[in-house]
Amino acid sequence: MSEITKITAQKRRGRYNIFIDGTYAFPVSETTLVDYRLAKGMVLTAETIAQIKSSEVTAMGLEIGLTYISHQSRTSKEVSDRLAKEDLPADVIQKVLTRLTDLGFLDDADYAHRYIEEHLKMGELGPRTLQHKLQQKGLKPDLLANELAAIPTTAWLDAAVRAGQKNLRHHQHRAYKDQLQRLRVALMQKGFDDTTIQTAIATIDPQPDPEAESDLLKLEAAKQWRLKAKYGDRERKQKV
């Protein structure tokens, strides 16, 4: 049996030092102090001390987890990875994840829903890209499939139109055919399916400007003529 002979507060708020039989033994958090009703004069068995130390590791993990998610929402995998960096045992990490979930601070389904909704409001990403990003955050495929399937096609179309209009503004100095090609490629890279891409382009309905198109073709021809300067005139004309 061992007796707690002194408890002192650390400079760090919510942390305490436990002294047993006149000697410093271990630190505890306020949560552990309260849970075990630790007080001067309390007699502890070796088993109880082991339990307290184990609980303290879990409490420390919970504190790290709470601090991590206080800045922004996180997935279970992100919190797990953060705790693993502290070399916490796997069973402790699982206890922390369970506790945070029970407290309502961790909810992967809600995270996926809000992440998708936020991107759909002002974003320009399609379902494939969003799915990839969320899978990297550790969300399960079946969960993502359900969340993405719940989004109406009109919402994806709106996002594709926003992305398409932005892309066209960036390439308005290019020839019409080149604009369309770059537009299709850009929408594919953002994760939209073929049907949504075709509908988005039809909705945007980009039109060629004959006068501007003529000027662009002349500029491109002049550029190619300069680039083919090493060839003879006849071959140069053929290549241009």
Curated annotation (Swiss-Prot):
Gene3D superfamilies given in the database record: Winged helix-like DNA-binding domain superfamily/Winged helix DNA-binding domain
Biological process according to GO: regulation of DNA repair
Function (record text): Modulates RecA activity.
InterPro entries reported in the protein's UniProt record: RecX_HTH_1st, RecX_HTH_2nd, Regulatory_RecX, WH-like_DNA-bd_sf
Name of the protein in question: Regulatory protein RecX
Family that this chain belongs to: Belongs to the RecX family.
Keywords: Cytoplasm
Gene giving rise to this polypeptide: recX
